[in-house]
From Swiss-Prot:
One GO MF term: DNA binding
InterPro entries: CB (IPR044068), DNA_brk_join_enz (IPR011010), Integrase-like_cat_sf (IPR013762), Integrase_catalytic (IPR002104), Integrase_recombinase_N (IPR010998), Integrase_SAM-like_N (IPR004107), Tyrosine_recombinase_XerC/XerD (IPR023009), Tyrosine_recombinase_XerCD (IPR050090)
Organism the protein comes from: Pelodictyon phaeoclathratiforme (strain DSM 5477 / BU-1)
Described function: Site-specific tyrosine recombinase, which acts by catalyzing the cutting and rejoining of the recombining DNA molecules. The XerC-XerD complex is essential to convert dimers of the bacterial chromosome into monomers to permit their segregation at cell division. It also contributes to the segregational stability of plasmids.
Source taxon at top rank: Bacteria
Protein name from the UniProt record: Tyrosine recombinase XerC
Active site annotation, chain numbering: R182, K206, H282, R285, H308, Y317
Protein family (similarity comment): Belongs to the 'phage' integrase family. XerC subfamily.
Gene that specifies this protein: xerC
Protein keywords: Cell cycle, Cell division, Chromosome partition, Cytoplasm, DNA integration, DNA recombination, DNA-binding
HAMAP family cross-referenced by the UniProt entry: Recomb_XerC_XerD
Chain ranges of the Tyr recombinase domain: 127-330
Amino acid sequence: MKDSSFTPSSTLFRGSTLPVADFLEKLSTLKNLSPNTVIAYRTDLFQFFSFLAQHLGLADLSLFDPEQVTTVEVRLFMAALIERGVRQRSIARKLASVKSFYRYLQESGHIRNSLFSALATPQYPKRVPGFLTEQQTEKFFNELLPQSAQGFRKPEKNELDESFICERDRSILELLYSSGLRISELIGLKVGELDLERGYVKLTGKGRKQRIVPVGQQAVDALKKYFEVRRNFFRMKRTGDAGELLHVFVTKSGKKLYPMLVQRLTRKYLTSVTDQKKKNPHLLRHTFATHLLNSGADLNSVSDMLGHSNLSTTEIYTHVTFERLKEVYRKAHPNA
């Protein structure tokens, strides 16, 4: 069940002095968090305070004192979320959001004491990400995809459209695996941020942090072919000059791609090679990281290429590579 419980009424914050808007603005401007992350914080806070209003019998928060919250209310909030089928990791994230807001209240002088300063956020083991094996990846990129990219989806109405979509999709998949992009980074990628001659891409990730990631030769070749077809496509369509397009990956009308389209095309193509439930762009990002570590890349370098701000985020992949090392050991060591 989705965690859309405790939707606040339009009058919930009427007369309230809680500086939620100021807190969210700080997250956006000073901490450079992405709009989606700020929205997640906002949703978490609104759900928490909506629950409190219901629990305390308040029509709005005009008379609410944030210091009156106790561990009892926090536990009841968690219990209510569990009852509604909210996942444990989502609950932990919501508590972390509330804890961060209360820390802001204390630092800005709105409250003197916060029970959240001594309240530990529940920690749950991170899921080991799914990935394609080296054999699956080789078969997909070197056999299935080159043979007939259009075989994965409904063909376009004419050869010109088909050629454009085919090469665009192929280069998207190649780049996702070659450089481990997030879907937002792929969609937002601009032509000037891609250097195919020197083989690298400049990415702007979470928190607007920039990084440079190598692009493999196979992806470079696919992108060069795509740009060639793209130029011809927009010239023949007479819908504008392809050189004027800002973004690398666009629709047939020249507009920037949207997330659902990339999710959909990735799922269709990857169905041919894996039966994993989540066949999304992140599967290729996980595959990128896992294959690098399997081939001996050091954790810090992989973390930099993924754009992780914390090395512990990258360490989840070491579980996968450790299992591979154990398999190699069992096969190679005489006393294994």
